[in-house]
Amino acid sequence: MNALTAVQNNAVDSGQDYSGFTLIPSAQSPRLLELTFTEQTTKQFLEQVAEWPVQALEYKSFLRFRVGKILDDLCANQLQPLLLKTLLNRAEGALLINAVGVDDVKQADEMVKLATAVAHLIGRSNFDAMSGQYYARFVVKNVDNSDSYLRQPHRVMELHNDGTYVEEITDYVLMMKIDEQNMQGGNSLLLHLDDWEHLDHYFRHPLARRPMRFAAPPSKNVSKDVFHPVFDVDQQGRPVMRYIDQFVQPKDFEEGVWLSELSDAIETSKGILSVPVPVGKFLLINNLFWLHGRDRFTPHPDLRRELMRQRGYFAYATHHYQTHQ
């Protein structure tokens, strides 16, 4: 564990009881908490939002906050402060969330509503150019001919931050499992910056703060390059990161070699967590100090996994990039 921070006591340690949901530390790390909505809360939430189809949430953005309020009210208004406290806490910053009884692809619309409610209790999800909505759903199959590693099943998708090739601030990332068939492997991979044993070395390197060019492939529907450094700091001077190996474009030999060594140092870290995410569950992480990726799948001709993502900004705190706006 890096000396910059240590895992601190949190709400889980205090034995506090919550209304409408439970909270426990995960098996993988005390930094990752598991939040489960009770069967009653789930049932009441879905009943109260049934009048709005997903299309209504797409067309009327204020409804995304309305469904969030409904969920928080069902949890005695304990949910929103807990989410914010956890995600903004450097010692944690990650949740694995599920709702009892929501675990089948036939409930895909209900999954989108639930994830939308949670996300809009902490901020607002950004427009996703790949899908043209505030969320994106995409499928991983046994054969893939796309232009990035997002849908390629038989290789590791390396650890990275989201939002590196767009100008919008990306404070959080939400990744939900909607469907899974004939699937072995493919766990989510997570790495907290303060558990990365090489952080000090790379954060203090002269290239860490040099603005670099990030460019996305055609499938992302983003044509404008953006420039920013790989590392920045938060309000307290602690390292945060905006990095993805696929889309950073080194301008010269020096940058290329450094980025290659950086990638190797991340991928070989002993601090990487392997987290199974069953259908209906979703990860919600602070994108500034958690990196995420995906392990490889075992090949199968009928392999299928459908995912939903949302990524956006925290509405209850200034963003954490301090030196490069």
Curated annotation (Swiss-Prot):
InterPro entries: GlaH, TauD-like_sf. Acts as an alpha-ketoglutarate-dependent dioxygenase catalyzing hydroxylation of glutarate (GA) to L-2-hydroxyglutarate (L2HG). Functions in a L-lysine degradation pathway that proceeds via cadaverine, glutarate and L-2-hydroxyglutarate. The keyword Metal-binding applies. Gene3D superfamilies: Clavaminate synthase-like (3.60.130.10). The keyword Flavoprotein does not apply. It comes from Escherichia coli O17:K52:H18 (strain UMN026 / ExPEC). Binds 1 Fe(2+) ion per subunit. This is Glutarate 2-hydroxylase. Coiled coil: none annotated. Its EC number is 1.14.11.64. Pathway: Amino-acid degradation. Homotetramer.
